[in-house]
Design a protein with these regions (language model features):
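N-terminal juxtamembrane cytosolic/stromal segments of multi-pass membrane proteins
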Residues: 1-37
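Membrane-helix interface motif
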Residues: 44-63, 120-133
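Loop-to-transmembrane helix junctions at the membrane interface
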Residues: 88-119
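Transmembrane alpha-helix entry/boundary detector in multi-pass membrane proteins
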Residues: 59-82
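Canonical alpha-helical transmembrane segments of integral membrane proteins
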Residues: 34-50, 86, 115-118
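Cytosolic juxtamembrane helix at the C-terminal end of the final transmembrane segment
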Residues: 2, 159-178
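Alpha-helical membrane-embedded segments
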Residues: 147-164
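Short, membrane-exposed interhelical loops at transmembrane-helix boundaries
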Residues: 132-147
Length: 178
């Protein structure tokens, strides 16, 4: 029989663990909710307001001219993005309902791989027309900079998916009875 001091410490430790679990679960739910909100905002903006991705020029008479930076190829990429965003929203809703470590990690890996596919397709299709920028140097540099940035994002996402996968495997190996 543990002494009263040890028993109190064990009970206090148990409460701290429960508090921590409750906070982290609440934090994850907040994160899932923020992800859902952000994905819905992106879905709406990039589906219905893409024409505002443009170069704006103020004319001498005070009027504003909007020159689109997107080509018609944007509409070849848009279904890929919309599909990914809808999958992400659905996955985050599912993770709010069912929140287990292994499940969460698998879903995050899948979503990250989907992100790599979306970014890789964006680089491949490259639906941008930077010729509307009035600076010749910027017109030459911007496509290169955007391509490099998107490749870095895709590689970063890929590394993130690989790290999550390795952590998941290590966690599962530690839990399996030997």
């Amino acid at each position: 029989v543990p002494s009263p001091a040890i028993s109190e410490k064990m009970e206090e430790f148990g409460k701290r663990v429960e508090d921590y679990s409750a906070r982290t679960r609440a934090g994850r739910i907040a994160g899932y909710s923020a992800s859902i909100f952000g994905n819905v905002v992106l879905l709406i903006f990039l589906s219905f307001f893409h024409q505002y991705i443009a170069w704006y020029h103020i004319e001498p008479d005070g009027s504003v001219t909007r020159l689109s930076m997107l080509t018609s190829d944007y509409f070849a990429w848009l279904p890929i993005l919309v599909t990914a965003l809808v999958i992400s929203v659905a996955a985050n809703i599912i993770m709010i309902i069912y929140d287990r470590y292994w499940f969460r990690e698998i879903i995050q890996i899948i979503l990250t791989v989907i992100g790599v596919v979306v970014v890789a397709n964006l680089v491949s299709i490259f639906p941008f027309d930077f010729s509307v920028i009035p600076n010749a140097t910027a017109v030459d540099i911007t496509p290169i900079a955007v391509t490099i940035f998107l490749i870095i994002v895709a590689v970063g996402l890929g590394v993130g998916a690989l790290v999550r996968f390795i952590k998941l495997i290590v966690s599962l190996v530690k839990q399996s009875p030997s």
